[in-house]
Amino acid sequence: MNHIFKHIPVMKKELIDSLKIKKNGIYIDSTFGTGGHSNEILKKLGQNGRLYSIDRDPIAFSIGSEIKDSRFHIINENFSKLLDFAKNEKIIGKVNGIIFDLGVSSIQIDDYRRGFSFKNDGPLDMRMNPNYGISASEWLFESNVKEISFVLKNFGEERFSRKIAYAIKRRSQIKKITSTLELANIIKKTIPTKNKFKHPARRSFQAIRIYINQELEEIQKALESTLKILKPGGRISIISFHSLEDRLVKKFMIKNSTKAIIPYGMPITEEQLNRLTTCKLKIINRILPTQNEINNNPRARSSVLRIAEIQE
């Protein structure tokens, strides 16, 4: 099966270099996508190295299944199931590096039939795995103004969330909103456009997508699981594309690289004390894209790469 997707990985060299790949190490690509990062890791692995890749998207899984390499294994699953997967593969505490390239992939955004794009018309779906969950169209139809407004405000940081929610429900009372351009045009007519370079529906589409796919919950669960999966000295490298993702990643890294403060006189066992005062992570770096990369790949503009390491 041939798959053609136009995809330029963001900060690919920086991400791969951050892993400090060991030839016979074990690595996990938590967001396979079109395989750009996985293929780079495989190039650096020796004969006894191993790479496991995960992606919830069936098309990404199909692309990965075409890689015929005994060192490589891919599963069609949410990355929140990383810990279960690692247990099944008996690699808990043995992994040298884990990468995440968060957000929507080119597989989803480039194919109008997936319903992610506010620029090209398609069915209003937005599910990263179309076989599970409720579509964006169904959710908007079934939800009330308060629920829609909450999602737009909290997951899209949309200032006009309530105004947009009212407009969506007014249209829904006439007919269900079933296409991406229909939704985009409702939003465009509802709120003022100050920046001609940024589509007024951008934040709302982001918010609905994040909610439909439970992205923030998935990220949080996956991040916590890395602490058990990685070996001492193992690295976690994460590229995020908007402030909600980056805030979550930053908070996770700071929390696990800072010793807890125990109130004086608080009764606590020695085991609990060791657990509370031992840092699990060491923050290595925060990298932003170069201006040259942003010029060549505008999607890189909002990206942030954060790197941390399990304490030896």
From Swiss-Prot:
Known catalytic reactions: cytidine(1402) in 16S rRNA + S-adenosyl-L-methionine = N(4)-methylcytidine(1402) in 16S rRNA + S-adenosyl-L-homocysteine + H(+)
Pfam families: Methyltransf_5
Superkingdom to which the source organism belongs: Bacteria
Annotated protein name in UniProt: Ribosomal RNA small subunit methyltransferase H
Cell compartments where the protein resides: Cytoplasm
Main location, first listed in the record: cytoplasm
Transmembrane annotation, as ranges: none
A single GO cellular-component term on record: cytoplasm
Job of this protein: Specifically methylates the N4 position of cytidine in position 1402 (C1402) of 16S rRNA.
The EC number(s) this enzyme carries: 2.1.1.199
UniProt: S-adenosyl-L-methionine binding residues: G35, G36, H37, D55, F79, D101, Q108
Keywords: Cytoplasm, Methyltransferase, rRNA processing, S-adenosyl-L-methionine, Transferase
GO biological process: rRNA base methylation
Gene3D superfamilies linked to this entry: Putative methyltransferase TM0872, insert domain, Vaccinia Virus protein VP39
Matches recorded under HAMAP family: 16SrRNA_methyltr_H
Keyword Cytoplasm: yes
MF annotations from Gene Ontology: rRNA (cytosine-N4-)-methyltransferase activity
Family assignment from sequence similarity: Belongs to the methyltransferase superfamily. RsmH family.
